[in-house]
């Protein structure tokens, strides 16, 4: 379990994902500049968010000014309430989270959802394990939204937020940090969630290709380790080779 931030570029850090499969604990990006802190995703629970906050304290970073949601999936947003900061997201993400926020979250509700939709059992069990205590839980709905693109300016850093959609989540955004040569791509090139996935679904090669840019050296997705541009490009090439080999 990660407990410390990893610096990936000047002023850019990562609270790394936990690779234990049933934890479903994704990466949380951290940008620190001019006395302000911006997070890329909120973590999968208030408990996860509290660990991120402790890691921020360890580098003497201020509490977050904003939290950017890369998409509306639970593991990226359920920590939002813990930071006391407004969230930024795509407008469709806001609509989705408004609906999710209206649900009666509890262990009983999770059990009822499993009965209604058995295909989602593993996801719902992971959700239950992550949150543990539902009594004071709430979903932080984004206050600031974009339709296609917006910029957030810190002291010396530009956050270029762009809606890219994709099969994994239609509300996915990527966050480019040109001065640091880092791009947060989150889950946008992943296949659909497990309960919606077909046998032929794989990584979105066209999405990967569209994000390749000589201006960026580090690519950070939602659940893996940071990759170089060449390593990120190789994901699409490997997918093509596997598809050709299966024909």
Predicted regions and their residues:
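Accessory terminal helices/loops
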Residues: 2-4, 103, 117-131, 209-218, ...
